[in-house]
Design a protein with these regions (language model features):
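Residue-level detector of Asp-centered blade-edge/turn motifs that repeat once per structural unit
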Residues: 118-120, 167-169, 223-225, 284-286, ...
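Conserved blade-ending motifs and adjacent loop-strand segments that build the rim/top face
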Residues: 311-334
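Conserved small/polar residues in nucleotide/adenosyl-binding loops
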Residues: 362-364
Length: 364
């Protein structure tokens, strides 16, 4: 090959690399930036009930490539309704409010699921608008029939990364914030059951709103043995779970302590536990603590720890680790069942996710 041919070949290779680079950048900008900031137009006037991407059969076929996860999710559940799984509603269209215009009705096509709670009668999923135009919501699903019942509109645009159910006082807690201060908000289950979007076109009323001392963000939460556990997501550093006390009425215990730098009442943790980075949810099961880890397009992990007085739940102390599809969010234990939820089915993440997963019920 003479010098001229070598030069032409190098130019050809450089052109191919340039095209590949441009196409890669276009894909990245579309999948990770554009879709997170835009919404699809819609003519719908109600919240959709069907799955956003897969039928149940399609979901099972896709997950069959993940043998361990598929086994946990579907094995032995043939006689259960929809193999024990629940569809996350509202990911195509959700009735909500246009935040800047108060009680103005609106449809959102960019809801992203985050929090998960299971009560005696319902499965509830929280979601926020990825374009930050609409109020956050909670989807209420009938636990027995698996049917979507209604959407409950929340005040403002909290990320609602965590839901927690207090079965003793029949209260649902959700994570929020104001002016950069982490908050926990409770809503009576009676209020949720009575809520009617068509009647009020207003956000649901809360029972208690409490600022949380000692935690930067309330990214996830759970309720266990009369206490509210709240954790903070950190991308690359260890973080904490804070345990807060509840009084006889089901309210978080507030205090005003100027020695702690407070100038208003806040809930102060009873104690802290140390956790590893990238935690999205926690759940207690007998003498074990289950922690979900995920970040971006990397595979998720479900890590099992033995509960310890040292309260040090970092990777090197784990008892067992399971590999899950990407974008695993909150987890909930009820009896011997583990409910897990993924945000990969949201409009903002569908193109950038290899494995798109709806809500699943996994048997421990």
């Amino acid at each position: 090959m003479n010098n001229e041919m070598k030069r032409s070949f190098r130019i050809f290779i450089l052109k191919i690399l340039a095209v590949v680079f441009v196409l890669t950048m276009c894909y990245f900008l579309y999948a990770f930036v554009y879709r997170a900031r835009t919404e699809l137009p819609t003519k719908a006037v109600v919240t959709n009930r069907a799955s956003a991407v897969y039928t149940l059969r399609g979901q099972m076929q896709m997950l069959s490539q993940k043998e361990a996860f598929s086994y946990f999710a579907f094995d032995g559940r043939e006689k259960e309704k929809e193999y024990g799984t629940y569809v996350i509603p509202g990911l195509k269209n959700t009735r909500t409010l246009l935040t800047e215009k108060g009680a103005t009705q609106a449809m959102c096509t960019s809801m992203t699921p985050q929090g998960l709670a299971v009560t005696e009668d319902y499965v509830m999923v929280s979601a926020y608008c990825s374009t930050q135009k609409h109020n956050s919501v909670i989807y209420v699903i009938d636990k027995e029939t698996h049917n979507f019942i209604k959407e409950v509109i929340l005040p403002g645009q909290p990320h609602v990364g965590g839901l927690a159910y207090d079965p003793d006082h029949k209260l649902l807690w959700y994570s929020s914030n104001i002016n950069g201060i982490a908050q926990a908000v409770s809503v009576k289950m009676d209020t949720i059951e009575a809520y009617d979007y068509d009647e009020s076109h207003l956000p649901v009323d809360s029972q208690q709103t409490v600022s949380l001392y000692g935690i930067v963000r309330d990214s996830f939460m759970t309720f266990y043995e009369g206490c509210l556990y709240v954790g903070c997501f950190e991308k690359y550093n260890e973080s904490v779970i804070a345990r807060y006390g509840i009084d006889a009425e089901g309210n978080l215990i507030n205090t005003m302590d100027k020695e702690l730098g407070m100038n208003f009442e806040m809930a102060v943790p009873l104690d802290y536990s140390t956790i590893s980075e990238q935690v999205q949810g926690i759940a207690f099961y007998n003498d074990k603590l289950l922690i979900s880890h995920s970040f971006g397009i990397l595979p998720s992990r479900l890590v099992v720890y033995e509960q310890s007085d040292k309260r040090l739940y970092v990777n090197e102390n784990s008892a067992r680790t399971y590999r899950f599809p990407e974008r695993l969010e909150q987890i909930v234990v009820e009896g011997d069942n583990l409910y897990v939820m993924f945000e990969s089915c949201a409009y903002a993440y569908r193109v950038s996710s290899v494995n798109i997963v709806d809500l699943s019920l996994i048997h421990i």
